[in-house]
């Protein structure tokens, strides 16, 4: 999947290409294989009992990181496709119609997310550093992810007007999402490591929330704004950490195992949720604030198959949600929890295509 070389919000750049060992765990309970009433038969068959009325919204290219507007009526997503050679941010209706460009069309963009009033969108872009698409990393150093230091975070009207730059410091600033009060949480390398920060919706009052050795990022608020969920890993001193820092100083990252964590919105009470092995990423809270959905390859010995899983916030009751043989990732619940949007390779006409799907969620 080519799009995995470039994604920023949640590892896409490398995670799927890795062959990571996956540890077995008695923490996981697969759901009963009973078909939902309106489940559409696909490559995954009737095992996905949490899904009803699955609809494919995009057709061809590399489409991912689709997120609902606050009123649940629209989606913002990023795409590379014919006529769009480098990731750009678009919005569309829930039926896949009325796609409109939101970003400038220059550079590479990632991680579009609606403000609570649905009048603006936040996203990251490299266009201020160079109007051209930044090159992918060389694989001479192994499978690595580019952490582009030209990424900065912007606010823009939903029609693409009134672009405002929110970050302007050296280093990678991206992976921005927004809480119900309009506060932004994002990932930055401004202090020499991949850490999570928050700031006001206009870019002020920047606060560092994590302070660990290792790649913390991909943060999302809970629906009530009290907690943040993210993927990460703390790397102890030693050869692995030295390699991590050496690459990061060159704007690169070699992903290793990743787990899901939660913390309070101010960075306190950081707690590890999963201990599965493999790479778990792209977590998002269910609106009830008690469950987290995420993507992981922990169950696949070769590490290439990513499925969606759900876990209680205390780490219990891991439940497998999808049964696809390739990639499912970037899940997000609608504000009322009635729908789920995600990206998948399933049923692709062209090998490597990644498309956006939406389903009715079955409790």
What are these regions (language model features)?
Residues 70-71, 116-117, 179-181, 223-224, ...:
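Residue-level detector of Asp-centered blade-edge/turn motifs that repeat once per structural unit
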Residues 39-62, 92-108, 156-172, 199-215, ...:
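Multi-bladed beta-propeller domains
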Residues 2-12:
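Bacterial N-terminal signal peptides that target proteins for export
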Residues 24-26:
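Bacterial signal peptide processing site
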Residues 59-62, 79-89, 104-109, 124-152, ...:
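A flexible loop/linker signature enriched in serine peptidases of the S9 family
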Residues 75-76, 121, 184-185, 228, ...:
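Hydrophobic beta-strand positions that form the internal "hydrophobic ladder"
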Residues 20-22:
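C-terminal motif of bacterial Sec signal peptides marking the signal peptidase cleavage site
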